[in-house]
C-alpha cells in the first residue's frame, strides 16, 4: 500500500471508531478477533457517546465522502432491515450533505463557460446552494437568453482523488473476501466493485448525465407517469450541467403528498410500472432512484406524475438479460419453481450439474410464503437473506451486470412501502411482464424483426449476385484445400507407417547384434553386420518422418 492509501485507511478506521460504530459488530465467536483488535486501539475512543447510533452512522458516512454516502443512500430505503431511528438518519444523506463554498462553485461555473463572468450567461444566480449531494451541488439562476428558471449543477472540487483512493482500498478488501468467507469466491466481489467503480466514475462526468437525462426525457415524453426536466446542452460540460428547475413534493414526504390529495395507491403502482417500463421496454433505466432524486408534481394529484432528477447512474440490459429476467419473474408469479430452477441452470448462474429437483424444492421453500400477501406483511430483506443461503448451497454466482438492477428494485420496493403499504408489487408487475413476453414471440415479433432488418437487406440486395458468386468460388477453393489436406494426411499416414516399420526392424537388428556380440563372440563379423543393418534401417525410418 502507498503512504496515501495507508493514511486513508487509518482515517477510515479512526472515523468508524470515533463514532463508536464498532457497536455494529455482532457478538459472535467468528468476530472475536475483530473485537479484540478493536480493544487494542484504546486511544481511539467513541467521541460521540451523546449521540444515538443512527446519527453516529450518518455522520461517519458523511465524513468519509461520496463512496460511503452512496452506500448509505442505498441502505436508507431498507426500512425492513433497520429500525426507524437508523433509517431516518440515513435518509438525511440524500439531500443534506454539507455544501462547499458557493464562491468556489461560481469560479468553477465561470471556468466552464470560457472565463466569462456568471452574469454574462445567467441572471439571479444564487450563491447559496439549493441542494448539496455527495458528488455535486446545485445553484439556482435564470437563463439570460429567455428568462427561464434553471438549476446549475457543479462537481465538488478535488473529489476524484478521494474516490479513487477509497476504491483502491475497497478493491483490496474485495480480494480478501474469498479468503475470509467460505462462499466469498461465488460472490465475485472484485467484479461487483468494478461495476460500482464504473458507475461512480461515470457520475463524475456531467456530459454523460446530460445525455442520460435527454434520453430518459425522450423515452417518457408523452407519459402520464414520469417527467424528466429539460436539459440545456449548450451550457453543459464535464464539470457543469444546466437544466430546467422543477417544483414538486419529495416522494419521501408522505404527509405532504396526502395533504395535497395525492392518489397514493395509483402513485405507488406507477412507480412499479415506471421501473418495469424502463427496464423491459427501453432497456435504459434510472439506477439511482433513491427518495432524494424523486419528486411528485403538485399538479393533478388525482393523476399523480413522478419527476426524476440526477440521471448520473443509469443501467441497460441486452435482449438475453431481459428475456431471462422476464421469464424468471413470470415463473415466480406463476409459482413455477421448476421453471425458475431450469432457467438458473440454463443461464449458467448455477453449475450445469446442479440437481434441479433439489434446487426447485429449495426455491419453493423460500418463495412460496411471500405470495398472496400485501407488501406491508412481507419482509423482503429476510426473503433475500433466505435466497442467499439457498444460493450458497447450490454455488449460485452473483451476476455483476445485474447489480444496478437489483439496487434499483430495492429502491422501488422501499418507496412503494412508504407510499402505499398495501401495494402488491407482484400483482402490479405481472400483467406488464406477461404482455412484454407475449410481444416477443409470434407473428408480430417476426414482422417487427423483419422491419428492423429490411433496410440492411435492401442495401445489400445489389451486391447479392456477387456475394453468391464469391461464396461459390470460395466453396470450391475450400473443397480443393480440404482434398489437398486429406491427401497430405493420407501420405503422412503412409510415411509414418513405413517409418515405424523401419524403426522397428532397426531396433530388432541392433539388439540382436548386441546380444550376439556379447554371448557369441565366435560368430565373427555377423553381429557387426546386424548392428550396421539396424542403423541403416533406423536412418531410413528417420528419413521417412521428415
From Swiss-Prot:
Binding-site residues, ATP: 130-138, 153
Query: Is Membrane one of the keywords?
Result: yes
Q: Which GO terms describe its biological process?
A: regulation of ubiquinone biosynthetic process; ubiquinone biosynthetic process
Q: List the disulfide bonds.
A: none
Q: Give the UniProt keywords, A-Z.
A: ATP-binding, Cell inner membrane, Cell membrane, Kinase, Membrane, Nucleotide-binding, Transferase, Transmembrane, Transmembrane helix, Ubiquinone biosynthesis
Its GO CC terms are:
plasma membrane
Predominant location = membrane
Keyword Chloroplast belongs to the record: no
The record ties this protein, via InterPro entries, to: ABC1_dom (IPR004147), Kinase-like_dom_sf (IPR011009), UbiB (IPR010232), UbiB_bact (IPR045308), UbiB_kinase (IPR050154)
Q: In which pathway does it act?
A: Cofactor biosynthesis; ubiquinone biosynthesis [regulation]
For membrane topology, the record states: Multi-pass membrane protein
Where does the record place the catalytic residues? Answer: 288
- The membrane-spanning stretches of this chain are 501-521, 522-542
> For the Protein kinase domain, which residue ranges apply?
124-502
UniProt EC number: 2.7.-.-
Location in the cell reads: Cell inner membrane
Q: Name one Pfam family in it.
A: ABC1
Could you give a GO molecular-function term held by this entry?
Answer: protein kinase activity
Under which main EC class is this enzyme filed?
transferase
- Family per similarity comment: Belongs to the ABC1 family. UbiB subfamily.
Describe the task this protein carries out.
Is probably a protein kinase regulator of UbiI activity which is involved in aerobic coenzyme Q (ubiquinone) biosynthesis.
Tell me the NCBIfam families matching this sequence: PRK04750.1 (NF003404), UbiB (TIGR01982)
Q: Any idea what this protein is called?
A: Probable protein kinase UbiB
Amino acid at each position: 500500500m502507498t503512504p496515501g492509501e495507508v493514511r486513508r485507511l487509518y482515517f477510515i478506521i479512526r472515523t468508524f471508531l470515533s463514532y463508536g460504530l464498532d457497536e455494529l459488530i455482532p457478538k459472535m465467536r467468528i468476530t472475536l478477533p475483530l473485537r479484540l483488535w478493536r480493544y487494542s486501539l484504546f486511544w481511539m475512543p467513541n467521541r460521540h457517546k451523546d449521540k444515538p447510533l443512527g446519527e453516529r452512522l450518518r455522520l461517519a458516512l458523511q465524513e468519509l465522502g461520496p463512496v460511503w454516502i452512496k452506500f448509505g443512500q442505498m441502505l436508507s430505503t431498507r426500512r425492513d432491515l433497520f429500525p426507524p431511528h437508523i433509517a431516518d438518519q440515513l435518509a438525511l444523506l440524500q439531500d443534506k450533505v454539507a455544501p462547499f463554498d458557493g464562491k468556489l462553485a461560481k469560479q468553477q461555473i465561470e471556468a466552464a463557460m470560457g472565463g466569462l463572468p456568471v452574469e454574462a450567461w445567467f441572471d439571479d444566480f444564487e450563491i447559496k446552494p439549493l441542494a448539496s449531494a455527495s458528488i455535486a451541488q446545485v445553484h439556482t439562476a435564470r437563463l439570460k437568453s429567455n428568462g427561464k428558471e434553471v438549476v446549475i449543477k457543479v462537481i465538488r472540487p478535488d473529489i476524484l482523488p478521494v474516490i479513487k483512493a477509497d476504491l483502491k482500498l475497497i478493491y483490496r478488501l474485495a480480494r480478501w473476501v474469498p479468503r475470509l468467507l467460505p462462499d466469498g469466491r461465488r460472490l465475485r466481489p472484485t467484479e461487483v466493485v468494478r461495476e460500482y467503480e464504473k458507475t461512480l466514475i461515470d457520475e463524475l462526468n456531467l456530459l454523460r448525465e446530460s445525455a442520460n437525462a435527454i434520453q430518459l426525457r425522450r423515452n417518457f415524453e408523452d407519459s402520464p407517469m414520469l417527467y424528466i426536466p429539460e436539459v440545456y446542452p449548450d451550457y453543459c460540460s464535464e464539470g457543469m450541467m444546466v437544466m430546467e428547475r422543477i417544483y414538486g413534493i419529495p416522494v419521501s414526504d408522505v404527509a405532504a403528498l396526502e395533504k395535497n390529495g395525492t392518489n397514493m395507491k395509483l402513485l405507488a403502482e406507477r412507480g412499479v410500472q415506471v421501473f418495469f417500463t424502463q427496464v423491459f421496454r427501453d432497456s435504459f433505466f434510472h439506477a439511482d432512484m433513491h427518495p432524494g432524486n424523486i419528486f411528485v408534481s403538485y399538479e393533478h394529484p388525482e393523476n399523480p406524475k413522478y419527476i426524476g432528477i440526477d440521471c448520473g447512474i443509469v443501467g441497460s440490459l441486452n435482449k438475453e438479460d431481459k428475456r431471462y429476467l422476464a421469464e424468471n419473474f413470470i415463473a415466480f408469479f406463476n409459482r413455477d419453481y421448476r421453471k425458475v430452477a431450469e432457467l438458473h441452470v440454463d443461464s449458467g448462474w448455477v453449475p450445469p450439474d446442479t440437481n434441479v429437483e433439489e434446487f426447485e424444492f429449495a426455491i419453493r421453500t423460500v418463495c412460496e410464503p411471500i405470495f398472496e400477501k400485501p407488501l406491508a406483511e412481507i419482509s423482503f430483506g429476510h426473503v433475500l437473506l433466505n435466497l442467499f443461503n439457498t444460493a450458497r448451497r447450490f454455488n449460485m454466482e452473483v451476476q455483476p451486470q445485474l447489480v444496478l438492477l437489483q439496487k434499483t428494485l430495492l429502491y422501488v420496493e422501499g418507496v412503494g412501502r412508504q407510499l402505499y403499504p398495501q401495494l402488491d408489487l407482484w400483482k402490479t408487475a405481472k400483467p406488464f411482464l406477461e404482455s412484454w413476453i407475449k410481444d416477443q414471440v409470434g407473428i408480430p415479433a417476426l414482422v417487427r424483426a423483419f422491419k428492423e432488418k429490411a433496410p440492411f437487406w435492401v442495401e445489400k440486395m445489389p451486391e447479392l449476385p456477387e456475394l453468391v458468386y464469391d461464396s461459390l468460388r470460395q466453396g470450391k477453393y475450400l473443397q480443393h484445400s480440404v482434398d489437398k489436406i486429406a491427401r497430405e494426411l493420407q501420405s503422412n499416414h503412409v510415411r509414418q507407417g513405413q517409418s515405424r516399420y523401419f524403426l522397428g526392424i532397426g531396433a530388432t537388428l541392433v539388439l540382436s547384434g548386441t546380444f550376439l556380440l556379447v554371448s557369441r563372440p565366435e560368430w565373427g563379423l555377423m553381429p557387426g553386420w546386424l548392428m550396421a543393418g539396424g542403423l541403416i534401417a533406423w536412418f531410413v525410418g528417420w528419413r521417412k518422418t521428415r
